Amino acid sequence: VTTAALAAELGISEGNLWYHFKTKRHLLESISEEFVRYSNERLALRPSSETDVIEGYIELMMAHERELLLYRFLYRDQADYGGHSQIVLDNITGLYDKSRAQFRAFFTEMVRVGLLDWPEDRIDHLTVNAIILIRFGLEYLRETQQAFDSSAVEQTFLQHLTLFEHQLDPAAAKRLRDAAARLLTDSAARAA
């Protein structure tokens, strides 16, 4: 992500961007504050008795997609700029703790309503693996020099489904896979 691209996204000149932020570090801190705020909003999503758990999980995946697309360079390029900004470092443990609780709540609810056949004592393992695939998928693509295009985020969702879709009710698995495929189709249309 270049400052020229950021300025274009905001509809301002690059010079105006630098007038406001002065340095790349100031710009990174501002983006990081917004990232932490957005992440905390996404982390508020939980299964609800008013919503089908699969619909809730699809909503969670869509929120993750928005987060990864908006802040993809924080995930993908951290090695290039020397690590996270201080606000992310100050919040990272809490963000991971909340992410584990969030995924655990969804997987536990899927088990409770009979959609996921998974041993209770292994839900934490599934939770951590799902987070690892979603969180580090972009970095993996970058480090292995695979194509990184607009469908990369959605591809990470398809990969994370392979962790548990074989233990899902077939109709629920199809709904999740179809939702991920729609994300891929929408992503390809945006890129065209």
Residue ranges and their predicted role:
Residues 87-113, 124-139, 155-166:
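Amphipathic alpha-helical packing segments from all-alpha helical-bundle domains
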Residues 44-73, 90:
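Hydrophobic alpha-helical connector segments
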Residues 20-47, 58, 62:
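An amphipathic alpha-helix adjacent to DNA-recognition modules
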Residues 1-26, 30:
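Helix-turn-helix
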Residues 139, 143-192:
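C-terminal peripheral helix-coil segments that are non-catalytic and often amphipathic
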Residues 46, 50, 75-82, 110, ...:
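Secondary-structure edge/capping motif, primarily at the C-terminal ends of alpha-helices
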Residues 76-79, 91, 119, 176:
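Short, hydrophobic secondary-structure boundary micro-motifs
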Residues 62-69, 77-83, 162-167:
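Helix-loop "lid/cap" segments that line or gate small-molecule binding pockets
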